[in-house]
């Protein structure tokens, strides 16, 4: 059985009709700026097997980040179904119970770390256990230390984010994601804000997770990152155009399509 199946995911961003420039004049005459639509996902289908590290690769604007956000209900899809470890979720009509069920099985790793600046590495990892799960602090600290050991930062448990390098901060965010032991890790450009050496270290850590039973879905625009995954799924214009061997030439994004610098996609 596949760990994760995605069926017919669709998403269109809409801008509401708004008064045009010089609204005071045009609004009285009835002239308004027309609403616009941008179809970002066009019926995406894919399957991820348990324990795989899969890269979803594509240039800026291809829809890859929006797809990942829909899978974790950070965006609501217009249509689509997610089957995760045998459980089915309607990506267009989820209630709070559905979202809670899904998030018990997934963890999201962001490009920007999103650490609490006034808390230590250990406190960042254990915050959710103590507040959301009401776990006693002593027990939460023990679990948190195990996660920091797993990412090679046990000796930095008392450090604040400002005392950590970018790569170390990303490792803390991964430890925080792992603390609930989710079967699926969703990572959005986790190496995008790092230099190439540190990025390879973080990617190596994500690759190690599949040996511990985790399934990793990694979003990237970078061919050199994607090629290290077990498999590449390439998106262009909101559609899957390649799904297969990560070392095949046709899996790669053409250099002319790559952004000059890594950019965080707002609607892609």
Which residues are covered by each model-predicted region?
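Conserved beta-strand-loop-alpha-helix hinge in the C-terminal portion
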Residues: 239-266
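ABC family nucleotide-binding domain
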Residues: 2-235
